[in-house]
Structures are given as C-alpha cells and as structure tokens.
C-alpha cells in the first residue's frame, strides 16, 4: 500500500526524497520503495525518517498503518 501520508509529509516540509534518504543513511531508491509501500523500513531507518520529517516513527509498525488513521491526527 502506497504511503501517501509519507510523501505528503515530506513535500509539506519541502524535502526531496534524496534529502530524506541521506538523513536516514539509505539510498534514494530504497527510500522511494518505502514511500511507495513496497518496503518496510528497519527500526533504525524508521527513527531517522521520523526525526527528519517530524513524526512518530512507530507508525511504520502499526498493525494497520492506514492513511485514515494518520490523517485523522491532522484534522483534529
């Protein structure tokens, strides 16, 4: 499942995929796979992405990491 919330968050903060990938110490292609939902990041990578983009990294490991739940936090 594509993580549209992740892309939206990155774009709102004004970062490129390359910048986030560099902060997470991974390649841009791997970050793209995380953003597209084809790869799940490790705990270490999740923490670095969360730190760079300013969100709780544990969202990557929730049973249902869906956009409705994430977006409900934005609209509250």
Curated annotation (Swiss-Prot):
Residues 6-60 form the HTH cro/C1-type domain. The keyword Transcription regulation applies. Disulfide bonds: none annotated. Pfam families: HTH_3 (PF01381). The gene is yqaF. Residues 17-36 bind DNA. One of its GO terms (molecular function) is DNA binding. Keywords: DNA-binding, Transcription, Transcription regulation. The keyword Transferase does not apply. This is Uncharacterized HTH-type transcriptional regulator YqaF.
